[in-house]
Amino acid sequence: MDYNVQHVDKRHAAGFHLVGPWEQTVPQGFEQLMKWVDEHAVQPLEWVAVYYGNPQETPPEKLEADTVVSVSADFHLPADGEGAITTEIAAGQYAIARVRVSNDDFGMSWQAFFAALLGDGKTIDPARACFEVYLNDGYSDGFWDIDMHIPVQ
């Protein structure tokens, strides 16, 4: 798998924090996020999923994720935030790979990316979260083009 390592600036984000199996919570979170963005006329810079924890070590019901849009640093939540949060995605060195995901099989792409990094002797930074940036509307296109980000030391 092709990837590059580069410094990524901090991102400001707004959206929803979820707990549970990613294959269930992330799609639900994006449905909630799309509705929230539309209802509050939020102007997203990017659509992003942030993943916390290691699914090989953490039980599925305890996995955490954020479904968010990146926003300007001066963004403020609407008064009726409907459970939305603001958060930041940490700056630092990240390995970044661009992939096309078919059949909603995001896990396979992530596993291949981790295997490539570990095979190349890269050290993953557990203090920062992994995240993916969506480059297209997979609901209408039938596939997802994403940039996967894994924090490295």
From Swiss-Prot:
Localisation per UniProt entry: Cytoplasm
InterPro entries noted in UniProt: AraC_E-bd, DNA_gyrase_inhibitor, DNA_gyrase_inhibitor_GyrI, GyrI-like, Reg_factor_effector_dom_sf
Keyword tags: Cytoplasm, Stress response
GO molecular function, one term: DNA topoisomerase type II (double strand cut, ATP-hydrolyzing) inhibitor activity
Pfam families registered for this protein in UniProt: GyrI-like (PF06445)
Gene3D superfamilies to which the protein is assigned, alphabetical: Regulatory factor, effector binding domain
SUPFAM superfamilies: Probable bacterial effector-binding domain (SSF55136)
Gene Ontology cellular-component annotations: cytoplasm
Family: Belongs to the DNA gyrase inhibitor family.
Function comment: Inhibits the supercoiling activity of DNA gyrase. Acts by inhibiting DNA gyrase at an early step, prior to (or at the step of) binding of DNA by the gyrase. It protects cells against toxins that target DNA gyrase, by inhibiting activity of these toxins and reducing the formation of lethal double-strand breaks in the cell.
Subunit structure: Interacts with DNA gyrase.
Name of the protein this chain belongs to: DNA gyrase inhibitor 1
Organism: Dickeya dadantii (strain 3937) (Erwinia chrysanthemi (strain 3937))
Gene giving rise to this polypeptide: sbmC1
